[in-house]
Amino acid sequence: MRTVLSGRTKEVIIDTEGPVIIIGESINPTRRKKLVETLQENNFDYVLELAESQIRAGADVLDVNVGYPGVDDVKLLPETVIAIMNKFDVPLCLDSPNPKAIEAALKASSGKCLINSLNGKETSLQALLPVAKEYGAAFIGLCMDDDGITNDPEKRVAIAEKIIERAVKAGIKAEDVIIDPLAMAVSAEPQACNITLETIRLIRKKLGHNITLGASNISFGLPGRESLNAAFMAMAVCSGVTCPIANPEKITSIVRSADLVLGRDDFAVRFVEYFQSRT
């Protein structure tokens, strides 16, 4: 299955047969004091620095989140989107819990964006499915619903099926639904990674959709996060993840290696290009 996103002119194809597409996570105020300070001043220079560094490091799509306490994201998210799109021809992933901010950003954007995110809750489906349909956007569907997050992989897949069915019923193409099986902290739930990996395998087998996840979530609260994230990322890609949301400076080498091992990089062209560009 192929999900097509686009910037002003550039298309990015997320394909279940690979290669892996990286969604850069760094434009997010969480733990980024400088980003909060510059956004408060309506200064987008640092946003553009983060965009450029991620693209250079291997990001194909950029996640854009401007959420911090007291922010007017209905105003700031579209302004940030315009600033990025004026300088870079790259597809954007619009990241906000506020449906009005998502809609405002979609109005301001060029190309085809990815909404981050919907879930199986009725309020979420009713608020955002019409928006995705109206603006022709793809979206990420989280495997959680009104009952919360289950540890049963089969139930997570059932939630994914529900989201896809509702999207299709709303007139959205099935291929424009990317599923997030949810990666949770292994420090809090010892089987968290196994649950996520099994959910990924089931989604790939039963539904055949593209799959994303927040790659660094599993290591929260632990030392050696980079090593743990790297191990999990390789396993997740082998299980069926096609477009992780992550720091490209940390995971591009892992993703290029996994694609090569899985036979998705003929004659190691992308692998060699990446490592030669780093020297």
What are these regions (language model features)?
Residues 1-178, 184-279:
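Domain-level signal for soluble alpha/beta catalytic cores
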